[in-house]
Curated annotation (Swiss-Prot):
Catalytic activity: tRNA(Gly) + glycine + ATP = glycyl-tRNA(Gly) + AMP + diphosphate
Name assigned to this protein: Glycine--tRNA ligase alpha subunit
Record GO cellular component, one term: cytosol
Family from the record: Belongs to the class-II aminoacyl-tRNA synthetase family.
Length: 295
């Protein structure tokens, strides 16, 4: 099964579980969790079921395309179900069956790995899912989002698409994966992987990135002051990416690192609180949709 078919299979499976199928969010981020499709929508009482592929940039992990499984940018297939259904674990195992992986014929383990993202003020009970000794998925129940208690609890399933594909296709090198017939992963992503690594470690303008961080921080504050949550959150994501570039370049000391993370966390918590307040002003409209659907 090639990568494109994997994605289409997962989209079809989760669409049948009443998930909205969305596209990736168009701002750089380090994980699918950081998308507003997840981080903002898991705040407050409104129901929300969604699935999407998210390209995730981690500058420090760039290896110029020379490492077989470590990447500047990888892809996650993200699923959020809020509130978490009682059978969410069985649904996940069914999704593996849809990919041709029979849980009865493989060693599938849920290894406790409670999750925390201090930059965004998020935490939850979690497990790594191991398939025959390889981690393929992170499974998390959100307990805190943007510094706020999660109520109801959301279930997050994050498939590592590259890892899953290397297992399914029995490949050692991610760049050898078949994305679709006639095109490999390397055909599509090797050049950008090399160029982004070169930029991150050799070319990026450190002074400019420090200036951008401060500019984005101020603009996020300005947007929040006008109750504009989504524009503010875009700038918070840009702050986070600028920080990641600086961190990868070795431009931030250990002491400074803590301070920069705290600045992003402060903004994220303000955005989370503001999002809740704005949805509350609207009367939590998705609750009304759910009530109407139940009737």
């Amino acid at each position: 099964m090639n990568v494109q078919t994997m994605i289409l299979t997962l989209q079809s499976f989760w669409a049948k579980q009443n998930c909205i199928i969305l596209n990736a969010y168009d701002t750089e981020k380090g994980a699918g969790t950081m998308s507003p499709h997840t981080l903002l929508r898991t705040i407050g009482p409104e129901p929300w079921n969604v699935a999407y592929v998210e390209p995730s940039r981690r500058p420090a992990d760039g290896r110029y395309g020379e490492n077989p499984n470590r990447l500047y940018q990888h892809h996650q297939f993200q699923v959020i179900m809020k509130p978490s259904p009682l059978n969410i674990q069985e649904l996940y195992l069914d999704s593996l069956r849809a990919l041709g992986i029979d849980p009865l014929k493989h060693d599938i383990r849920f290894v406790e790995d409670n999750w925390e993202n201090p930059t965004l003020g998020c935490a939850g009970l979690g497990w790594e899912v191991w398939l025959d000794g390889m981690e393929i998925t992170q499974f998390t129940y959100f307990q805190q989002v943007g510094g706020m208690e999660a109520n109801p609890v959301s279930a997050e399933i994050t498939y590592g698409l590259e890892r899953l594909a290397t297992y399914i296709q029995d490949k050692e090198n991610v760049f050898d994966l078949e994305w679709v017939e006639g095109f490999t992963y390397g055909d599509i992503f090797l050049q950008p992987e090399y160029e982004h690594s070169t930029y991150t470690f050799e070319v990026s303008n450190v002074d400019m990135l420090f200036d951008l961080f401060s500019t984005y921080e101020k603009e996020a504050e300005r947007a929040l002051a006008r109750d504009l949550v989504f524009p503010a959150y875009d700038y918070i994501l840009k702050c986070s990416h600028s920080f990641n570039l600086l961190d990868a370049r070795g431009a931030i000391s250990v002491t400074e690192r803590t301070g920069y993370i705290a600045r992003v966390r402060t903004l994220a918590r303000k955005a989370a609180r503001k999002y809740y307040e704005e949805r509350e002003k609207l009367g939590f409209p998705m609750l009304k949709k759910e009530d109407a659907h139940d009737e």
